[in-house]
């Protein structure tokens, strides 16, 4: 097969591993920077050009689209879909999961457990917003943040009000969530491919750090997940319509709570923690599914 990887940097761990996995399994592989692609939209035959040549003959494409280039990256992916190229994750599913408000609305509509969450832009009554989510302590997030950036734990009502007012000054949309104390600064990353959790790791925040992101000094270790956690992760990925997803769960007194469904989960932490060839599993999934050229949205909404 001829497989394209949409990635801006071929030297990133996840991209390198996917290149290796494609080559090991006998496929032709090419890394494509989506931002450098340009497209013919109006033609009877949709085309993508890159570095002065037409990109043609691809059987499948693996999107590794960074959050900052979601709009153009998914537009390029959509063009590949129009050309009949099989996407490991569909453009509509990526767009859906990148919108934190939309994804949480979809998950809540289907009864998926999640922390009590408030969304706001310019709330008239900050006190009422805090009451609505059960009061302090709360976690306050900028909607556009990734890797733990723009995430603040406010332990008192006064601190929460100050942070919300400061974020409002940035003219940013914000999310206010209950703080799940019993999670102890840890979360579970479930790696879903198709309809299976193929690996899971526990991410523990550094000392004194409530965020468990590995980019912020968190550590990863192998974890055994419960049947309920497995079911929740699979269902969350399915609702988003993602074939490949990293589902982040918190362990709470009322069961697993979904924090986020990531459409471009990193491979380094989870491969190191579990010793599994996850890149190979992604390519194997593509081999089984690309032949049928199925690009119909798996999710609803």
Swiss-Prot record:
Cofactor(s) essential for the protein: Mg(2+); Mn(2+)
A Pfam family it matches: RimK
Keywords of the record: ATP-binding, Ligase, Magnesium, Manganese, Metal-binding, Nucleotide-binding, Protein biosynthesis
Keyword Metal-binding: yes
EC number(s) reported in the record: 6.3.2.-
Domain ATP-grasp per the UniProt entry, residue ranges: 104-287
EC class of the enzyme, as a word: ligase
PANTHER family the record matches: RIBOSOMAL PROTEIN BS6--L-GLUTAMATE LIGASE (PTHR21621:SF7), RIBOSOMAL PROTEIN S6 MODIFICATION PROTEIN (PTHR21621)
Stated family: Belongs to the RimK family.
Protein name: Probable alpha-L-glutamate ligase
């Amino acid at each position: 097969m001829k497989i394209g990887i949409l990635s801006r940097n071929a030297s990133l761990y996840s991209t390198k591993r996917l290149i290796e996995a494609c080559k090991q399994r006998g496929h032709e592989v090419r890394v494509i920077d989506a931002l450098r692609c340009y497209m013919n939209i109006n033609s009877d035959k949709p085309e993508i050009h890159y570095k002065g040549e037409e990109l043609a003959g691809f059987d499948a494409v693996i999107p590794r689209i960074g959050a900052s280039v979601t709009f153009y990256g998914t537009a390029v992916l959509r063009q590949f879909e129009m050309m009949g190229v099989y996407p490991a994750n569909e453009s509509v599913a990526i767009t859906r999961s990148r919108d934190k408000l939309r994804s949480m609305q979809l998950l809540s509509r289907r009864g998926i457990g999640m922390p009590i969450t408030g969304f706001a832009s310019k709330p008239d009554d900050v006190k009422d917003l805090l009451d609505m989510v059960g009061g302090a302590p709360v976690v306050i997030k900028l909607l556009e943040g990734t890797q733990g950036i723009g995430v603040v734990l406010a332990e008192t009502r006064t601190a929460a009000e100050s942070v919300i007012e400061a974020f409002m000054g940035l003219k940013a949309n914000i999310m206010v969530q209950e703080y799940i104390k019993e999670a102890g600064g840890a979360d579970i990353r479930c790696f879903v491919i198709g309809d299976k959790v193929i690996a899971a790791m526990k991410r523990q925040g550094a000392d004194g750090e409530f965020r468990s992101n590995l980019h912020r000094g968190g550590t990863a270790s192998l974890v055994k997940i419960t049947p309920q956690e497995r079911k929740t992760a699979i269902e969350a990925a399915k609702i988003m319509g993602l074939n490949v997803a990293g589902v982040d769960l918190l362990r709470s007194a009322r069961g697993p709570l979904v924090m986020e469904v990531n459409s471009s989960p990193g491979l380094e932490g989870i491969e190191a923690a579990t010793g599994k060839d996850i890149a190979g599993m992604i390519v194997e999934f593509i081999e089984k599914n690309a032949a049928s050229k199925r690009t119909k949205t798996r999710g609803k909404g």
